[in-house]
């Protein structure tokens, strides 16, 4: 809650806070639009819910709108994707999927469904 108050204070009156994060279905690896498999991100969803709860409970911001869309991030190799995923909190790469990613012909894409929400600061 402290962080939300600081953000609120930093915004100009009526300023906008943008929040973008993945939403279900699970994130997956793809090659040429073909799925290699889904990541285990159940723990990540728990983190998202816990993180969003204070924003939804506060009277500092009013939700103005949201849009959902597909987000693709391209990697030059499967190894590069797997290395990047090591820093992702709450995401686990199943062993069989990691093998498929390593063997995949590059480029390898990370596919996510995301939501972008716009909140207006209340005064």
Model-derived segments and spans:
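Acceptor-substrate binding/catalytic loop of class I
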Residues: 35-52, 67-75, 89-92
